[in-house]
C-alpha cells in the first residue's frame, strides 16, 4: 500500500500534499504495527503454552504453577488470534475503501499499448482477474472480522447487563 506519495494540484497548479493521504499512511502504519505485534503475541503465547504443557505432562515439576502458566498462555493465544483477525479485517476493509479509479490508475497506459491489448483480454475473463480473487479474500476476512466484532459486542452487552443487575 503506497499512500504517502499522492500529490494533488491546487487551483494555481502548485503541487500540494493531500492531508488525507498522510492520515491514511499513519493508519496503515498503525495497522501494520498491530498486525506485527499480534502475530508475535500469537507465536510467543503458543510457544509458551507448548513448553508449559511439555513440562506439565513430563511430571518432573509441581503441577499448579505450570497449569496456571498453561491456562494463561492459552488465553493469551486466543486473545492474540482475535486481535490478529480483527486487524487483518481492518486492513482488508481499508483496502476495499480505495476507489476503483485509484486501482485502475496504477496501471500505466503504455504497458497496455505495448502488450497489444492482451491485458484487456486477460482481465475480461473472471478467472484471470486478480481483483475477483482479492474480493473473495476480502469478503472472507470481512466476515471473520464481523463475527469477531459481533462476539465482542455480545460480550460487552452481557457484561453491562450483569453490572446493572449487581448494583
Swiss-Prot record:
Residues 122-135 have a biased composition (Low complexity). Its main location: secreted. GO terms for cellular component: extracellular region; host cell membrane; pathogen-containing vacuole membrane. The chain crosses the membrane at residues 33-57, 63-88. Induction: Cotranscribed with incD, incE and incG within 2 hours after internalization by host cells. Detected at 4 hours post-infection in HeLa cells (at protein level). Residues 94-167 are annotated as: Sufficient for interaction with human 14-3-3 beta protein. Keywords: Host membrane, Membrane, Phosphoprotein, Secreted, Transmembrane, Transmembrane helix. A motif (Phosphorylation-dependent binding motif) lies at residues 161-166. Residues 97-167 are annotated as: Disordered. Phosphorylated, possibly at more than one position, in infected HeLa cells. Phosphorylated by chlamydial kinase Pnk1. It is found in: Secreted; Host vacuole, Host pathogen-containing vacuole, Host pathogen-containing vacuole membrane. It is a multi-pass membrane protein. The modification Phosphoserine is found at residue 166. The record marks 166 as: Interacts with 14-3-3 beta. Inclusion membrane protein probably involved in early modification events of the chlamydial inclusion. In infected HeLa cells colocalizes with host 14-3-3 protein (YWHAB); phosphorylation of Ser-166 is probably required. Interacts with Pkn1. This is Inclusion membrane protein G. The lineage of its organism: Bacteria, Pseudomonadati, Chlamydiota, Chlamydiia, Chlamydiales.
Amino acid at each position: 500500500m503506497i499512500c504517502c506519495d499522492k500529490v494533488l494540484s491546487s487551483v494555481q497548479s502548485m503541487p500540494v500534499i493531500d492531508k488525507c493521504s498522510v492520515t491514511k499512511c499513519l493508519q496503515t502504519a498503525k495497522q501494520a504495527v498491530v498486525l506485527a505485534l499480534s502475530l508475535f503475541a500469537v507465536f510467543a503465547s503458543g510457544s509458551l503454552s507448548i513448553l508449559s504443557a511439555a513440562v506439565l505432562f513430563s511430571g518432573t515439576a509441581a503441577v499448579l504453577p505450570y497449569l496456571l502458566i498453561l491456562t494463561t498462555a492459552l488465553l493469551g493465544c486466543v486473545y492474540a488470534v482475535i486481535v490478529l483477525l480483527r486487524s487483518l479485517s481492518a486492513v482488508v476493509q481499508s483496502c476495499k475503501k480505495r476507489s476503483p479509479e485509484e486501482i485502475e490508475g496504477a496501471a500505466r497506459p503504455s504497458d497496455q499499448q505495448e502488450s497489444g491489448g492482451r491485458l484487456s483480454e486477460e482481465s475480461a475473463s473472471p478467472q484471470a482477474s486478480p481483483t475477483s480473487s482479492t474480493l473473495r479474500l476480502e469478503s472472507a476476512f470481512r466476515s471473520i472480522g464481523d463475527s469477531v466484532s459481533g462476539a465482542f459486542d455480545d460480550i460487552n452487552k452481557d457484561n453491562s447487563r450483569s453490572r446493572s443487575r449487581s448494583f
